[in-house]
Structures are given as structure tokens and as C-alpha cells.
Amino acid sequence: MALPGSSTVFLLALTIIASTQALTPTHYLTKHDVERLKASLDRPFTSLESAFYSIVGLSSLGAQVPDVKKACTFIKSNLDPSNVDSLFYAAQSSQALSGCEISISNETKDLLLAAVSEDSSVAQIYHAVAALSGFGLPLASQEALGALTARLSKEETVLATVQALQTASYLSQQADLRSIVEEIEDLVARLDELGGVYLQFEEGLETTALFVAATYKLMDHVGTEPSIKEDQVIQLMNAIFSKKNFESLSEAFSVASAAAALSENRYHVPVVVVPEGSPSYTQEQAILRLQVTNVLSQPLTQATVKLEHAKSVASRATVLQKTSFTLIGDVFELNFMNVKFSSGYYDFSVKVEGDNRYIANTVELRVKISTEVGITNVDLSTVDKDQSIAPKTTRVTYPAKAKGTFIADSHQNFALFFQLVDVNTGAELTPHQTFVRLHNQKTGQEVVFVAEPDSKNVYKFELDTSERKLEFDSASGTYTLYLIIGDATLKNPILWNVADVVIRFPEDDVPSTVLSKNIFTPKQEIQHLFREPEKRPPTVVSNTFTALILSPLLLLFALWIRIGANVSNFTFAPSTIVFHLGHAAMLGLMYVYWTQLNMFQTLKYLAILGSVTFLAGNRMLAQQAIKRTAH
């Protein structure tokens, strides 16, 4: 039987909030991303290099160029048999096209073999070896390895090392490739970690993606697991697939190559778990649907998906465990209609098994289970303060409005009691938001109170006019009482017009302007009173001290007049003039410092003037000494 204030449908909301424990993929290629990547690669050919990026990049994604025959003709017509790079692009592109065979001469073969030398760059060696492999020509792998190792010792860049890994994947398994394989561990040590989520080279996305593709291709070739931790693989994956739009063909090609390597190799296949469909279900369809794919959003239908446990976030109690998902088409489904979940948040631990290559295969899903709230036992009461009169109680049923009005004044209080229950299980609920709003029908004033439950989860709101007059500004009148109930786990938040309440405050407490009060009128201007200035001494005092300071100068002039001033040794040499002008300028600078400049500005100017004055004075005194010596 449905409770009052409820509907008969129980709704669940399942929302993936976050993975809070193990490191899981945050970026991968959705089906839309894969199509966008294909569109980035499917461009008109402008050169043999662009043809290589388009053809081989699309091939990595399991696609082909629209016109294979036309592409093959373009490769043959643009091939330069005397250029190693051109031969590399042609050989690799023709391999990715069905029925596109390119024949080369012995001279071209000799050119490629000659390029496999320690005098060539690592890139040239890589292109030559890959071209020979693409054309199906024999190669002395051990000699090529020696040339590659010698050259790599001279080129220690990340890109050169990645190209060395790519080269080694074309060499014979009989060759001793351990020295090249060991470079993988060194490259991993050079990766930069960002926020514990991303891992990449400072050289950028393209180099990082090529490293991933080259590493797994080489490891598949030699049959050894790469020295990369599972968490590092996920961090590399997050960095590579965080970018969705590509500036160049080469960048799109590198991402496609990395995606192909991570989706199919012998050691590490990251698992992507994504919820499917609408987050809301009826009780008859309480089914969690998950898409389990690789990084290219290709379904892993051969996998086995199990729920390890489902725990309540609030109580940490386990409510469901060791339950298998069922594969329906490409989607894994978990039917938990028979389990009575109370509303709230749950942590679902899901594990994907069936292949020992799977990594990031344990996923924590935050699941929100929502329900509908029912309001029961709603009582409205007026309680006499002196308790001389028995309380008057009226029961009202949601969503009806109580008939008549209720009065709260200096003689009696108004009280509201109610309970909140889960309409599906009948369990008591305590939503996060339970408010009582009182709206003045005349002035529009609103006052909101929080309704709190007691120990028995019975909500109570009591209005005592003597205690609440400040909230209401002592504004008497008829108020509409609303009950507001909300929570993230509720499917039916409630705004209920419960009753009309007449609130009367004592006349002495009512402000004369309460109804005409306008809170948006300009406030009274603030007149700031500054501190009274300190009393200064009389002018005669300051003048007296000024005269005392100037008295030595007056004495100097008096003595000059009496005994005479000897200026016979003064010359008009540049050093003499500059010295006296510099000295005067420094005295003037002191005045400017006093009136305008700060200490640091003054020191800067003083350093310039002082240097010039010092040099000029030194020159002037030297000339005076020479003059005395001559006489």
C-alpha cells in the first residue's frame, strides 16, 4: 500500500561519480573520437609522407583509404628511388594497401643497405631497415644492430631512442636485441608525471604516442613483457588520449598507432568501463548496464564481469557481493531488482576478468540510488503558553492544504509535526534539506526556518512570537506556510503549501515604518574624521634654527670679504668645471630627495653623479699636482 504523499513508482538513479581508489583511465577514444581521428587521417595526399600517415594511420584503426587503387598509383608516381625517406614511406604505405606491389632495382637495394651504417642518423637507419622489410628484401640483422647501437650512443635524444625501438622490431629475433630493449626502462625514467594522472615526455604528445607504439611492437616481437608498470600504462594512456583535435597528420598518426598498440598486444590491454543508458530506472528495471571496451571503444565481449561488492557510503555495510553480470549483446547487465536498497550512495566494485592481459580491470563506481519521499503524520497545533487550554491539533494530508487559519500570538504558539518516509521500503528518511518557509501575503516578506528531527526522526517546527520577532521584524499579518523538502537522492522534491498562519506581535514591538521599509534606499553618508594634526612650534622657533644652520655660510662670506678669496689657482679646464658642477648637482639632488624622490631613486642618481664627479675631481687634482711640480 502506498503511503500518503507518495506515488506507487519507485525510482533508482545510478550515477557514476568517480573512481576513488585504483588509477583508472580518464581519457580514451570513444566511438565519436575514433571517427574524428579517422577523419583527421583521411585527407587528400600532398606528398608521399602525407600518404604514409593517412594510409598507415587508417590501417591502424582497421580502416582503409576510400580509393586503394588511386592511392597505390600516387605512391608509385611519387616514389624517388634515390631517396631513403621516400622509399620508407612507399614501402610502409604499400604494405598497408591490398594488392599494391612495388618493385625496386638492385641499385635501390644497394642504396638502402648502404644507409644501414653508423655514419647515418638513427632516423635514416630506421627508414632504411623498415623499407627493406617492407619490400621483402634480406638484411643482416646483427650488422644492422651494430650500426644502430653505435649511432644511438651519439644521439641520445628521446626521439632517436624511440626510432631505435622501431628499428629493432624489424630485425631478426636471432639478433641480440637486449641492448635496445633495455632502452625502454631508461625512457620510462625520463617520463614526466603530471598530477599523478598523466605521464609524458617533455617533447610532447607525438613522441609519447610513438614510444608506446614502438614499445609494444618490439615487445611482441621479442616475446618479453615491457618494463612498464600497469599504472604507468594508464597514465600514458590518459596523456595520449586527452587530446581530441590534432594539428598535423603526423600527430594523428602517432595517436592512431598508440591506440592500436594498446588495444591489441600480448601484455597490457587497458579496460574501459562506462555506464550505459539513462541514470533512472523503475523498480521492475533496476539494472546496471556497463559497456566494457578497449581504448578504441571496441567491446570486450569475451570478458567476464563481476560485482565484487556493493557498500553503502554512509554505513560502509555490504549489501550485495559476488554477483556476475550477464552479457546482452555488447552490454553487460546486473539485475538487482530483488535487492532492497535504501536510498543513498553506494560504492560498486566491479572487476573485469577473462584475460590476464587486462589492466585497470577493477573499477569503483559511485552509484546513487534515489527514491520518492512520503510525508506522513502531519499535525498542525496551536498550544496555549499557560497550558490552561488543551492544544488544538489538525491533521492534514499531502498535498491538500489545511482548512481555516492558525493563530500564533503572545498567548499561544504554533507547532508543526511531520515524518518523512521512503515510499518503497517504509523506512524513515532524513533528507539534507527540510525547510519551513513563511510568506507574508501582504508585504511579500519571507522567513525561512530549518526543521530538525528529534531522536525518533519526528520533525518539529514551533513558532513562539516572543522569540521570533527579530526574524519577522515584528511584522504581524497572515503568512502562508510552505514545507520544502529536497535531497540529491530524492526523485520528488516537495514544495507544499500547508496552511495559512496569522501571526500577531505586540503593538509595542511593531516599528512604525515596518510596512514601508525599503532596504534599497541610499544609506547615510559616512563622514570620516581624520586625526587632528600635531601642534607645530611657533614660526619664530623654526626661523631661528634656520638662521643657525645658515650661519656658517654667512661666516664664510664674511671671512672672504675680510681676508679675500684666493681663486688664482682656479682653471677653466673641463675637469675643473665638471667637478664643481657635479658637486653642485649633488647638493641639488639632496633638495630634490627632500621634496620628491625616495631613497632608492636618489641612490641611483647619486651613483651616476658621484662617479662623474669623482673622476673629474681626480683629474683636476692630478693637474694641480703636475702644475705645482712644474713650478
From Swiss-Prot:
Its main location: endoplasmic reticulum. GO terms for cellular component: oligosaccharyltransferase complex. The keyword Transmembrane applies. It is found in: Endoplasmic reticulum; Endoplasmic reticulum membrane. It is a multi-pass membrane protein. Residues 562-571, 618-631 are cytoplasmic. Keywords: Endoplasmic reticulum, Glycoprotein, Isopeptide bond, Membrane, Signal, Transmembrane, Transmembrane helix, Ubl conjugation. Belongs to the SWP1 family. Component of the oligosaccharyltransferase (OST) complex. OST exists in two different complex forms which contain common core subunits RPN1, RPN2, OST48, OST4, DAD1 and TMEM258, either STT3A or STT3B as catalytic subunits, and form-specific accessory subunits. STT3A complex assembly occurs through the formation of 3 subcomplexes. Subcomplex 1 contains RPN1 and TMEM258, subcomplex 2 contains the STT3A-specific subunits STT3A, DC2/OSTC, and KCP2 as well as the core subunit OST4, and subcomplex 3 contains RPN2, DAD1, and OST48. This is Dolichyl-diphosphooligosaccharide--protein glycosyltransferase subunit 2. The lineage of its organism: Eukaryota, Metazoa, Chordata, Craniata, Vertebrata.
